[in-house]
């Protein structure tokens, strides 16, 4: 028998063996309550959080303001916004005072010229998260074992429009050599990787409003499956501009309520659209034994990650919430958790009539009678909708809820409709009370029908 034939038979035999093994693993998994595939590998915990949000900059300062019922939504000023139906947004506060964002605290003046605003915000959030975690890899081995996954939902449109205008009116030489790097969605991850010499997986996600959740979930799997020991994961977006607001307004996605304190009101009968926000959130995810060995403070554990697609409409969710239901079910399945073990859901709920209703239906259909024992809240009344950063911000809020055992409120929810009959943590924060482990879900859904759910638990 020739060597070629022998090698061919070996390869064929190996493929058949692998196929049978995969079939056996799949056949042993039920819908809920099985040994999750991720647990056949390694546990993943969260040891650091960095937040750059409309509520401020930091970790515990932002959390305290969230729990205190504060909001970062403000009125838009300037003639350029006068013709746009939406007149509110949620800006990151700029300045040098406590809780304000000063770009020069994180990058040099020359870097500011070569980087976009969302990239700088991501660098700031990453620095805060790594400092919070106490993880600063110095050796080659530690750098190779640490990766980055930071996504961006939208490129900064004003950079494109201003560059196009300069090119058309002033010519080729007025196009910045940094134009292309500024608008690449992977540049936030790339800059963080370069800055800290992180040589593990270098990953960027761009899945609209699900970006941040996908980045955190993908990082969870990178660690669980041994691609890294530590991941610096999150999302960033900073695209509040007349052009982006006009685009979302034309899509009838934004609130037209001119009162910044009432414009974003998830689950409310008079909700009429979301409020655009900006910011970045980065979490340090770490293999459990790695964190224990270096005596890191552990906020929570990531138990599972679910994904789904609506396959329905470019902007509207499935009206029955079928995609959202499958997404949450997939996260429970991955975590090996029963629906009755969940006691909190950080809802995607952006304050749109269709989206909030669909998510509410999905929760009630999946959890059945147990839905009435759940607490469900949306934090977007406080932060606005941070688009590509939203999923990471809300993963951070769910993590902190597990750690402090407090549930962030749904602001502005002073009345409800008959179908919205769950505990939405209205107006004020609540103590998280359960006789079981503190386990929550956080949902993110985006244009194009892209969905993600993370299952996060206290230790």
UniProtKB/Swiss-Prot annotation:
GO terms for molecular function: 3-oxoacyl-[acyl-carrier-protein] synthase activity. GO terms for cellular component: cytosol; mitochondrial matrix; mitochondrion. It is found in: Mitochondrion. The lineage of its organism: Eukaryota, Metazoa, Chordata, Craniata, Vertebrata. Keywords: Acetylation, Acyltransferase, Fatty acid biosynthesis, Fatty acid metabolism, Lipid biosynthesis, Lipid metabolism, Mitochondrion, Transferase, Transit peptide. Residues 1-27 form a transit peptide. It holds the Pfam family Ketoacyl-synt_C. SMART domains: PKS_KS. It is an enzyme of class 2 (transferase). The active site is at 209 (for beta-ketoacyl synthase activity), 348 (for beta-ketoacyl synthase activity), 385 (for beta-ketoacyl synthase activity). The modification N6-acetyllysine is found at residues 109, 174. SUPFAM superfamilies: Thiolase-like. Widely expressed. Higher expression in heart, skeletal muscle, liver and kidney which contain high levels of active mitochondria. This is 3-oxoacyl-[acyl-carrier-protein] synthase, mitochondrial. Disulfide bonds: none annotated. Its main location: mitochondrion.
């Amino acid at each position: 028998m020739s060597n070629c034939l022998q090698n061919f038979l070996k390869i064929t035999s190996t493929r058949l063996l692998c196929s049978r093994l995969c079939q056996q693993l799949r056949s042993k998994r039920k819908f809920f309550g099985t040994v999750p595939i991720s647990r056949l590998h390694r546990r993943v915990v969260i040891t650091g959080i960095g937040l750059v949000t409309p509520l401020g900059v930091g970790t515990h300062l932002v959390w305290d303001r969230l729990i205190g019922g504060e909001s970062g939504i403000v009125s838009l000023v300037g003639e350029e916004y006068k013709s746009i139906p939406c007149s509110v947004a949620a800006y990151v506060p700029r300045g040098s005072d406590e809780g304000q964002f000063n770009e020069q605290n994180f990058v040099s003046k020359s870097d500011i010229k070569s980087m976009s605003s969302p990239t700088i915000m991501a660098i700031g959030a990453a620095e805060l998260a790594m400092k919070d975690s106490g993880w600063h890899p110095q050796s080659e081995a530690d750098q190779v074992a640490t990766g980055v996954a930071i996504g961006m939902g939208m490129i900064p449109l004003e950079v494109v429009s201003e560059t196009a205008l300069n090119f058309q009116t002033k010519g080729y030489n007025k196009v910045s050599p940094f134009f292309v790097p500024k608008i690449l969605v992977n540049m936030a991850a790339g800059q963080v990787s370069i800055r800290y010499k992180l040589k593990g997986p270098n990953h960027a996600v761009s899945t609209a409003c699900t970006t941040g959740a996908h980045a955190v979930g993908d990082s969870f799997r990178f660690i669980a499956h041994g691609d890294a020991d530590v991941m610096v994961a999150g999302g960033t977006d900073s695209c509040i501009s007349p052009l982006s607001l006009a685009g979302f307004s034309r899509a009838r996605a934004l609130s037209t309520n001119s009162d910044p304190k009432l414009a974003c009101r998830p689950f409310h009968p008079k909700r009429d659209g979301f409020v655009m926000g900006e910011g970045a959130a980065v979490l340090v995810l770490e293999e459990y034994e790695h964190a224990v060995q270096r005596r890191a403070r552990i906020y929570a554990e990531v138990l599972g990650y679910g994904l789904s697609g609506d396959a329905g409409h470019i902007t509207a969710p499935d009206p029955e919430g079928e995609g959202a239901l499958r997404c949450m079910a997939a996260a429970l399945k991955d975590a090996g958790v029963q629906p009755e073990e969940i006691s909190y859901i950080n809802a995607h709920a952006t304050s749109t009539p269709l989206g909030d209703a669909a998510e509410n239906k999905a929760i009630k259909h999946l959890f059945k009678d147990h839905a009435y024992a759940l607490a469900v809240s949306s934090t977007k009344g406080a932060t606005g909708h941070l688009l590509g950063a939203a999923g990471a911000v809300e993963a951070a809020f769910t993590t902190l809820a597990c750690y402090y055992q407090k549930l962030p409120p749904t602001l502005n929810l002073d009345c409800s409709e008959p179908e919205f009959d769950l505990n939405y943590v209205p107006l004020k924060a609540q103590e998280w009370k359960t006789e079981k482990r503190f386990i929550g879900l956080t949902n993110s859904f985006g244009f194009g029908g892209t969905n993600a759910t993370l299952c996060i638990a206290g230790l």
